[in-house]
Structures are given as C-alpha cells and as structure tokens.
Swiss-Prot record:
Pfam families: DUF3944, Ubiq_cyt_C_chap. Belongs to the UPF0174 family. Disruption phenotype: Strand-specific deletion mutant, which disrupts only yaaW, shows no difference in growth compared with wild-type strain at 37 degrees Celsius or after heat shock. Biofilm formation is increased at 37 degrees Celsius. This is UPF0174 protein YaaW. InterPro entries: DUF3944 (IPR025217), Ubiq_cyt_c_chap (IPR021150). It comes from Escherichia coli O157:H7.
Length: 237
C-alpha cells in the first residue's frame, strides 16, 4: 500500500534526523500504547518500507513515508482518499492547537506555535509531577533551579526545552504521555486524575474531531516533531 507524501517544508528537516530518532517517531505513529500495530497505519502495510525491515537505515531512507504517515493521521480518512494524501503539517499543528484551546495566531510561524505548545505541555506536566519526578526531570536537563518559572526561561534560552519534553515523552515514568493521556496533560481535561506515576484514570476510544483527525496520535506526534525540529536545528548551528 502506498503512503503518499505531500511536499511539506515544515517536515523536510526529518531527512536530517538520526535512524533512532525516526524509528522512535515512526513507532509512535504506527503502534498503540499496548505495542500493537494501529489498524489505520498505512506505513506498516507499505511494501517498500516492509522490504527494508532490518536494514540499518530503514527509517532514514524512508523519512518521506514516515512524514506521509503523519499527514495521513492528520486528515480525515475519506478526505484523504479523495485527494490522495493527508494534511500538511501546519494544518495538523493548527488543528491540535485549536483542540487544546491554545491561541495560535495564523500569522505566527510554525516554530512559534510549536514553542507555545511545548511550553504549555511542560507547565501542565510539571503540575502533575511528584517531587521525585521533578528531580528526575531537572537532572535530565542539567538544571540547577527548582521552580518551573525559573526553569522555563533557561530552557528557552539554552534550547533545552526540546530535550526536556523529549525526556518526558520517552521516559518510562510518563509513557502514558506518548498516547491518549497527552491530552489530559495538555489541559484539555479528557482524562481526570491521571497522575504521571499512576494508572490512566480513563481510556479514550479513538477521540476524533469533526475533521476526523485522530488526536490520540497527532497530539503526541506534533509534540515529538517540535522536539525533533529543535534538536536538528541545534546540531546545525
């Protein structure tokens, strides 16, 4: 099955990501929180991608297919079939921002909207952390301050925000944030009382907007794209 990638300047940077970064991002798209392949995944049924299973650069050589998978999840399935591809990343980002009630001005750059999203994610996650998790996070970003309001300016200035959010998304203690619970942490209130170290308080059965966007996939995916963009940018400076 083909994955049609729509040329997207906001996703072109993915070609500069490492194999590990792309493999982790692809898995976020293609597998659910139980480690099972999503039935709606197109990438996992793509013959070219499957033929490179075990190749050391399977994901790097197919970054456009991975980007196309994100575009696929960002668009309505029926609309995707009609136009032959999914949505551009910026449209997905604006959809996510609207869903999470973030004030994203269309005049803002993609980078600025992402920055706003990352900051809100970090603020809401911090509120749900116990002291042990806070200290683990501070250690992960090499921070010497203990309060979030002191930490945020440093993260912005030193380009460590992406490192911090990536730690939260990938760490075992917050694995629920990689899936549907990301919406709760961002403040949308779809889940109640789901602490970072505790069990998920409720399960989402494929939350979708009128447009058909699968937010249980696109919200954590957009967060990860924002992180990867900053990591790649930092290596190119």
């Amino acid at each position: 099955m083909n994955v049609n990638y729509l040329n997207d300047s906001d996703l072109d940077f993915l070609q500069h990501c490492s194999e590990e970064q792309l493999a982790n991002f692809a898995r976020l798209l293609t597998h659910n929180e139980k480690g099972k392949t999503r039935l709606s995944s197109v990438l996992m049924r793509n013959e070219l991608f499957k033929s490179m299973e075990g190749h050391p650069e399977q994901h790097r050589r197919n970054w456009q297919l991975i980007a196309g998978e994100l575009q696929h999840f960002g668009g309505d399935s029926i609309a995707n079939k009609l136009r032959g591809h999914g949505k551009l990343y910026r449209a997905i980002l604006l959809d996510v921002s609207k869903r999470l009630k973030l004030k994203a001005d269309k005049e803002m750059s993609t980078f600025e909207i992402e920055q706003q999203l990352l900051e809100q994610f970090l603020r809401n996650t911090w509120k749900k952390m116990d002291e042990e998790h806070k200290q683990e996070f501070l250690h992960a970003v090499d921070a010497r301050v203990n309060e979030l309001e002191e930490l945020l300016p440093l993260l912005m200035k030193d380009k460590l925000l992406a490192k911090g959010v990536s730690h939260l998304l990938s760490s075992q203690l917050t694995r629920i944030l990689r899936t549907h619970a990301a919406m709760s942490v961002l403040g949308h209130g779809l889940l109640r009382g789901a602490g970072l170290g505790g069990p998920v308080g409720a399960a989402l059965n494929g939350v979708k907007a009128v447009s058909g966007s699968s937010y249980r996939v696109t919200i954590p995916a957009v967060l990860q794209i924002a992180c990867l963009r900053r990591m790649v940018s930092a290596t190119q400076v």
